[in-house]
Amino acid sequence: MSKKEIDAARRLMSLMFKAHPWHGVSMGDQSPDLVTAYIEIVPSDTVKYEVDKATGFLKVDRPQRFSNFCPVYYGLIPQTYCGERVAKLFGARAGRPDMIDDGDPLDICVLTEKAIPHSD
């Protein structure tokens, strides 16, 4: 197939199927300096959302209470994984050797003056 045919097939497939935000979306060509982020929670949310690991759809995790209000855009970095090795690295850098992994993609908090609405 030519590049033009491959690009056309990709566009067609993207209309039929949704890429899994954890595995099917690139971290970005300029990573680690500039990364793609999948936003799960925006500051105005009264509900905590989370990507369902099996389907990739955004699901309701639990209601947000006043004590755990998220003041920034919060989400994940695609194609990353916080496993034992990552936890040890971060723990050593933070001076906290007791850190453990959570088996999820790496979290990200996005600081911006621009509004980012939900659009999954």
Residue ranges and their predicted role:
Residues 1-120:
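Hydrophobic N-terminal alpha-helices or hydrophobic patches in metabolic proteins across all domains
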